[in-house]
Regions:
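C-terminal coupling/interaction segments
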Residues: 233-279
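Catalytic Walker B motif of ABC-type/P-loop ATPase nucleotide-binding domains
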Residues: 146-150
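ABC-family P-loop ATPase nucleotide-binding domains
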Residues: 75-134
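Conserved ABC transporter NBD signature motif
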Residues: 56-69
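The feature captures the beta-strand-to-loop junction immediately N-terminal to the Walker
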Residues: 31-36
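ABC transporter nucleotide-binding domain
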Residues: 164-247
Length: 279
């Protein structure tokens, strides 16, 4: 079953447009949504959540999103939360009347696990604690789909690792879907099963993370040698001392050129090459 199905999505702004022809999000997977600032990541997530009007077709759990859909969806979107003078108890009171399946015991268990101070107002919480509270609030009605927009942005490595670990616990049973945008690609690599790369409002790449890392590699060579490698060269970039090429079909390339050394390409390497490469 597909958790999300997108067809011919178009959202136009004055100086930008998002145009996604087809995108299907499988059930029970973690998907890392990557792209440069302004690429359209937040716009895509807000369209899925029906926070923007758009052209095209988006189905969540096989139907157009409606009020009852949010019983099965949890979301963390920047600059969208409760009144900053609220305390944790006030947040709980609102969540109890918002979601039929809200689990107050689970909420406080998670809050205690994160050592959340119950007596502080939201505007007195640290950035890390506020993000933890947002994530707890998003999952304590047991949603099947969790949408997170930059949940680890601006946080120190220890807090980010706590949040990633918490998300791992949430998905361990295998039936939850997470769509998770971040510009911190090391976080994406830790948790994602699939990578979705958006560039200038267009879907550039969508594949399993492990498959991507196996398919692509980086070759350091001279500019003169580039012509020898034909269609294996996807993108190139040059610096003062050498030319680097993003190679596709690495295993086949090594069979043709066994003496060439191809370095592993991580998700960040692939994104940078595809967005800025010279070829």
């Amino acid at each position: 079953m597909k958790t999300i199905e997108i067809n011919n999505l178009r959202k136009e702004f004055k100086d930008f447009d998002l145009d996604i022809e087809n995108l299907e999000i499988p059930e029970g997977a973690v998907l890392g949504l990557i792209g440069e600032n302004g690429a359209g990541k937040t716009t895509l997530l807000k369209c899925i959540l029906d926070l923007y009007r758009y052209d095209g077709d988006i189905k969540v759990f096989g139907e157009e999103i409606h009020k009852e859909s949010f019983e099965k969806i949890g979301a963390v979107i920047p600059d969208s939360f409760f009144n900053d003078t609220f305390k944790i108890k006030d947040v709980v009171d609102i969540l109890k009347v918002t979601y039929k399946n809200f689990d107050e015991e689970m909420f406080y268990d998670c809050a205690d696990k994160f050592k959340m101070p119950r007596d502080k107002k939201l505007n007195e919480l640290s950035t890390g604690n506020l993000m933890k509270l947002k994530i707890i609030s998003a999952i304590c009605h047991d949603p099947d789909l969790l949408i997170l927009d930059e949940p680890t942005s601006g946080l120190d490595p220890v807090i980010r690792d706590e949040i990633i670990g918490f998300l791992f616990d949430y998905i361990k049973d295998g039936d939850k879907t997470i769509l998770f945008s971040s510009h911190i690609l090391s976080d994406i690599e830790k948790i994602a099963d699939y990578i979705i790369y958006i560039h200038e409002g267009r879907l550039i790449l969508y594949d399993e993370k492990d498959s991507l890392i196996e398919k692509y590699g980086i070759l350091k060579t001279s500019e003169e040698n580039l012509k020898n490698y034909g269609d294996f060269i996807l993108k190139t970039r040059k610096n003062k001392y050498s030319t680097e090429a993003l190679i596709k079909n690495v295993q086949v390339f090594k069979e043709f050129y066994p003496n060439e050394v191809v370095d592993r390409a991580n998700v960040e390497d692939i994104m940078i090459f595809l967005s800025r490469g010279g070829q």
